[in-house]
A protein has these predicted regions:
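Short, low-complexity, Pro/Ser/Thr/Gly-rich segments in the mature regions of secreted, periplasmic
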Residues: 108-127
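Mature extracellular/secreted ectodomains of secretory-pathway proteins
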Residues: 1-104, 111, 115-116
Length: 127
């Protein structure tokens, strides 16, 4: 995704950005596209993906090229009107990935708590 903000890059910046975001999400989900009941995910990776989305939104809104133009026109209809639908859509993605990471971390915490409780309340074995 750094390629999007490289002055020397002459290719399709939108394709580069979307491919980078897609790849990041797949990596955050453990390189999987299908999940089953007992599959698990690392909540920290999902959380990190959410922070990366925030960084991308910030860079798209603020980073300029050598001619003081944005690398990608993302949230402007014309020079006097801002189009905030871009930020709203990315805000939804950030909110969903944050909530998903929180839910996953709660699941992990509950599993650890159950193991500790069953261990501490277990029957002593004779020796």
């Amino acid at each position: 995704m750094n390629q999007v903000f490289d002055d020397n890059f002459k290719g399709d910046r939108v394709l580069s950005l979307i491919t980078g975001l897609y790849t990041m999400l797949i990596k955050a989900h453990g390189d999987k596209k299908e999940f089953y009941m007992f599959d698990s995910l690392d909540p920290q990776k999902i959380y990190n993906a959410s922070r990366n989305f925030e960084i991308i939104v910030w860079k798209l809104a603020s980073k300029k090229n050598e001619e003081n133009q944005p690398y990608l026109l993302s949230n402007e209809i014309n020079s006097s009107q801002a189009n905030l639908s871009f930020e709203r859509e990315f805000g939804k993605i950030i909110g969903r990935t944050d909530y998903f990471a929180f839910t996953l971390s709660e699941k992990t915490e509950r599993a650890v708590t159950r193991v500790i409780q069953s261990f501490t309340t277990g029957i002593f074995l004779p020796f």
